[in-house]
Curated annotation (Swiss-Prot):
It is a multi-pass membrane protein. This is Putative manganese efflux pump MntP. It comes from Pelotomaculum thermopropionicum (strain DSM 13744 / JCM 10971 / SI). HAMAP family: MntP_pump. One of its GO terms (cellular component) is plasma membrane. It comes from the Bacteria. Keywords: Cell membrane, Ion transport, Manganese, Membrane, Transmembrane, Transmembrane helix, Transport. Belongs to the MntP (TC 9.B.29) family. GO terms for molecular function: manganese ion transmembrane transporter activity. The keyword Ion transport applies. Probably functions as a manganese efflux pump. The chain crosses the membrane at residues 6-26, 34-54, 67-87, 102-122, 131-151, 160-180. It is found in: Cell membrane.
Amino acid sequence: MSFFTLMALAVALGTDALSLSVGIGLTGISRRRILQISATVLLFHIFMPLTGWLVGEFTGSLIGRAAAVIGSLLLVGLGVKMIWAAWRNGGETEPSLVRFNFWGLLLLGASVSMDALSAGFTLGTRQVNLLLAAGVIGLVAGAMTAGGLVFGRFLGSRVGERAQLLGGLILVGIGIKLFF
């Protein structure tokens, strides 16, 4: 696999994380939280292709579907909560809505890296340095996540009171997309 092909794969696998992170960043987020979320996504995007390669397609598809359903429900729930808070409070942001604890970070990382699990099955059948591929995929996804969070934070400061509503709508949309 050429480096260009690997980079294209990495960018494609990072797009869910990018779009989700813009939605999260819209409500305002600290630098520390940006690092935590980006590192979580990075690690999951390294771990999942390796898991896909090691575990095999059948077991991975069962685990992957359950994690995708849980992750998508989490995103829809968070998005609905943000929309409700924006509606109820006239658009005032509540950063506590996007504070992720340990389990929340794990679910977030799993929900946006299911495609990387599937990619691991394919990479395992090719003549490719799997550790290098997983590392590149993880680094690109982590960088895309950080960029999305920073952009979302910037955009949220410009959009003002509608940022929470917009962020909630984005999260609901991504959650629904990940479900199907």
